[in-house]
Amino acid sequence: VTTYSPNPTVEFDGGLTFADNTISSISIRAGRNDVLEQPQPSYARIELWTDASEPLAVNLSDAVTVSIDKGTSGQEQIFSGIISDVEISLDGYGDIGSIARYTLTAVGALAQLNKRLVGASGFSKEFDGTRVFNILAEAFLTSWLDVNPTLTWQQLPTQTTWATYDATNEALVNALSTTVDVPGEYELTAYSGGETNAYELVQQAAQSGRGVLWEGGDGHLHYDDYSARLDNTPLTLTDDDILARGLRTTAQWSEIVNDVTVTYKANASKTARDEQSVILYGQLAGTRSTQLEQATAAQDQANAFLTSRSYPRTYPETIIIPLHSPTVSDATRDALTAVYNGLPVVTNDLPAVFGTSFSGYVEGWTWNLTRYTADLALTCSAFYETYPHLVWFQIPATTTWAGYTPNTNTWEDL
């Protein structure tokens, strides 16, 4: 039995810091809801209390970070972004004192990417990781060609430097060499569609490479190529960690796809179809658009999409861990305060209605914090949705072990 309080800390530009009873509540959402999508921009909703006679020196676009205590020692940064909304209300006002509530919304780096343009000079044929790197570098670095030729330093605020001009994030760009998997796994066709939204173009590249572009709690952007998750160390969760109340699973007809089309270079396409699934559920078609260069890669992705979606999914949609619970270990708290997209999660302690065991990957997460409590809700996908394997309905009824290919397969392979 261990005791724990998250003791969240909120820090703004210039070192302005809030902690303890000045924090009402904090909620943070990051990642994605489905393995077939790309993550949306992360956001934080921060509620602070202060004296109404002392306005806070916070402004739109100011940087903000949120950190919480780890299980063992020290703090972990779980969010970094810029302020997008400021709302002020009064909880109390009178002769004996006043309380103002600041409700701040902050957004992560992907939201900033959505306000950038790239691609005016096009991109050569290259692999997915290289394309992602090039798009991000172009989006976040301001070059001389981006500057109005008539602009002079005298026309800018006195505190402006080249490093801060246009909110350029040099630290983020410098980190790309270690946070982006280069070159990637899939070759993409050349891009010559002209200047366009950076967020949309980089998501297309990531989706085409079956990778994922996500935001870390430290504010850096990460791109994991398709094979990256195989190297991650699994976290085992027990019934001491998981909040059983509220577990839910929903088998949805709308998620089933048994007739797949994948488009690639020059609007060519490849298809895949699962006849057993069609017999069971009817024809349920789905299309995935890519920037792939090679026909073999398009067929590979069509087959994988079909395998992962031709039958319903039956595992918990969300797993909630109350880090403040005395049954959660400090080691587990340390691992979860550093949660990331692609963290492998394993448990054998689910109620029987959920199949008892689950192995998969964290796709998204939501923090709900007060001074004393920390609930972390994990949105997960099953292992087979990233690295598909066969289910019984996909094996012909006439198949025998003696005739199965490859003959090195074992029961655990299916």
Show where each model-derived region lies.
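Generic short alpha-helical hydrophobic face used as a protein-protein interaction/packing hotspot
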Residues: 50, 87, 110, 209, ...
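Glycine-centered loop/turn motifs
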Residues: 59-63, 194-195, 340-347
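Beta-strand-rich assembly/attachment modules of structural machines
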Residues: 1-126, 373, 381
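Charged- and aromatic-enriched interaction segments used to assemble
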Residues: 75, 92-252
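Acidic, small/polar-enriched beta strand-loop surface segments
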Residues: 1-19, 123-130, 200-359, 367-372, ...
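Short coil-to-beta-strand transition motifs
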Residues: 72-82, 350-361
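Generic structural motif
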Residues: 8-10, 23-28, 64-66, 174-184, ...
